Amino acid sequence: MEMNARLALTLSGIFMFAAVALGAFGAHALKGHLDPDMTAVWQSAVQYHAWHALALLGVGSLMLHWPQKRGLALAAWLFTAGITLFAGSLYAVALTGMRGLGMITPFGGVAFLAGWAVLAWTAWRA
């Protein structure tokens, strides 16, 4: 599937909806059910999830102005992968207590870093 402004903006909306819902779920439904360490893991997942959904919103907006910049599409895919792998694995660790799932988290972190690097490079060359 090709990443374009419409898809990036749609994914951003979906990811932000999910981040808000998961933040509320963690603050209310999980309150008292997770130990403090796992609560911190959950909060980190929500924070990185939301920030990078906003980054995806920004990239999607830039794609409206520069649709020919393929680097923007790559950055959008990298932020999408980062949210899925980084935040997704942290949510799973917090809910299950299976710390081994945390081995996935660095792959999401690398995707976030690569997304920011690609975005910076694309902007520099614009």
Would you name each region that the model predicts?
Residues 1-126:
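Polytopic transmembrane helical bundles with strong interfacial aromatic enrichment
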